[in-house]
């Protein structure tokens, strides 16, 4: 049913908790294709606002290169377990709409994303990419708590 799975990653250990479940899904035949997605946001620093020269294109390239290198490392780790994944880096702010749009435009069946599981004031203060994806995605979403990846 969920053959094409999207895993948004931001470079954090928390985000990678989703990989444990995706690996199981692939190994048990529930998923065939895995796409790793990193969303970067490149914004001019405050110095640019005050007339200091800043090469935004150089900064953008550095962000894309770092995200691409990170995803290549994740792909390599998955590859050692026999799981092939493709990866892509996109630019957008905030990240949630980029993730939901990417899933819809590329015909993906499931978004698997880790979440802190914050509630109440913590959720309001910190925001939640996972919650925004859950509320706005037309693609089914599987939320993974870090504790679940350890079991």
Stretches found by the model and what they are:
Residues 18, 46-49, 97-100, 123-125:
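Short, well-ordered secondary-structure micro-motifs
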Residues 7, 34-36, 70, 113-114, ...:
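Short, structured motif recognition centered on aromatic/hydrophobic residues
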Residues 24, 76-111, 151:
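Structural beta-alpha unit
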Residues 39, 92, 146:
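Active-site loop/turn elements of alpha/beta-hydrolase fold enzymes
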Residues 1-54, 77-79, 83:
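Small/aliphatic-rich secondary-structure junction motif
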Residues 104-151:
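Gly/Ser-rich helix-loop-strand patches that form or flank binding pockets
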Residues 39-69, 150-151:
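Acidic, proline/glycine-rich short linear motifs
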């Amino acid at each position: 049913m969920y053959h094409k799975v999207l895993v948004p990653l931001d470079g954090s250990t928390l985000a990678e908790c989703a990989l444990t479940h995706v690996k199981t899904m692939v190994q048990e035949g529930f998923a065939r294709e895995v796409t790793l997605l990193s969303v970067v946001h490149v914004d001019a620093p405050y110095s640019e606002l005050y007339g200091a020269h800043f090469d935004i294109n150089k900064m953008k390239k550095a962000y894309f290169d770092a995200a691409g290198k990170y995803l290549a490392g994740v792909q390599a780790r998955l590859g050692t377990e026999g799981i092939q994944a493709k990866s892509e880096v996109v630019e957008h702010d905030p990240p949630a709409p980029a993730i939901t749009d990417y899933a819809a435009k590329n015909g993906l069946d499931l978004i698997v994303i880790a979440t802190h599981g914050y509630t109440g004031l913590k959720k309001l203060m910190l925001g939640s990419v996972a919650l925004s994806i859950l509320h706005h995605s037309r693609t089914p979403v599987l939320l993974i708590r870090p504790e679940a990846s350890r079991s």
